[in-house]
């Protein structure tokens, strides 16, 4: 098992589990909540076939990485990513973020710059700013996030069942573009994540990435489904597309939040073409 230490909590090392396959231009894939690097299975296969070096890692608290009690904020996540790419000595790499992972892409470039980054991809991502504030009236009211936290604290497994039904739009796509087994597989990954980490991450969904996006100066692709119930396109991708100079927007018709699984046939060719 490959892992990299990004910190310490008491006597234990905080380790990030990762997988590093193939040769060629490196691509770092950053997963969403509450999943792990395993959620990129269909994209890893496509990118390897296209001749890339493909690297996935599990965010702290998720997948096979350590589950510390602290550090569930985007400054720390970006620092973890910085330590990770530094220890792997990556150069000229593409960053691809799904959902929450798009926040790492934005905060990493906003904090550390794009000197080592070749391209950026946001897939069904949370930026630019989900929280409703006086200067962001299009955002989501904070009470919604508080309600989610209460539901997770009360019964996280039950919350995840409802969450993944909306993640994949099971009522519409079940038995067609998504199987019960894939939904159950996602639930199994999610329920095995850190309970505290899962809860703490909800607060990060209100992070303001507007300044980070303004600092992105590499070719950027934004991919989003127009049927996304988790991060609706109008509040996220449409605005990210406008915020990043020269960014290209790909709208996947009928695509839910989990479109990397349900619509991999649409996502993968565009991703491979953009990263070549």
Predicted regions: what is each one?
Residues 76-93:
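Conserved acidic catalytic loop of the alpha/beta-hydrolase fold
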Residues 227-231, 257:
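Acidic catalytic loop of the alpha/beta-hydrolase fold
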Residues 31-33, 93, 97-102:
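Conserved alpha/beta-hydrolase "nucleophile elbow" surrounding the catalytic nucleophile
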């Amino acid at each position: 098992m490959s892992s990299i230490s990004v910190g310490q909590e008491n006597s234990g090392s905080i380790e990030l589990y990762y997988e590093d396959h193939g040769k060629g231009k490196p691509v770092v894939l950053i997963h969403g909540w509450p999943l792990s690097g395993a959620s990129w299975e269909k994209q890893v296969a496509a990118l390897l076939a296209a001749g890339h070096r493909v690297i996935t890692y599990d965010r702290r608290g998720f997948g096979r990485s350590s589950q510390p009690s602290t550090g569930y904020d985007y400054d720390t996540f970006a620092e973890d990513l910085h330590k990770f790419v530094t220890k792997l000595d990556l150069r000229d790499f593409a960053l691809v973020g799904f959902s929450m992972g798009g926040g790492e892409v934005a905060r990493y470039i906003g904090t550390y710059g794009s000197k080592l980054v070749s391209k950026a991809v946001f897939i069904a991502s949370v930026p630019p700013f989900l929280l409703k504030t006086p200067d962001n009236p299009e955002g989501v009211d904070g009470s919604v996030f508080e309600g989610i936290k209460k539901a997770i604290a009360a019964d996280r497994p039950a919350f995840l069942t409802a969450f993944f039904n909306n993640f994949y739009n099971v009522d519409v796509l079940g038995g067609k573009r998504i199987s019960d087994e894939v939904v159950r597989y996602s639930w199994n990954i999610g329920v095995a994540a850190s309970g505290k980490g899962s809860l703490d991450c909800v607060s990060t969904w209100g992070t303001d990435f507007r300044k980070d996006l303004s600092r992105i100066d590499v070719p950027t692709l934004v991919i989003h489904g127009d049927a996304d119930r988790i991060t609706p396109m109008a509040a996220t991708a449409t605005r990210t597309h406008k915020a990043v100079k020269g960014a290209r927007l790909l709208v996947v018709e009928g695509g839910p939040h989990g479109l990397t699984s349900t619509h991999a046939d649409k996502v993968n060719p565009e991703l491979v073409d953009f990263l070549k």
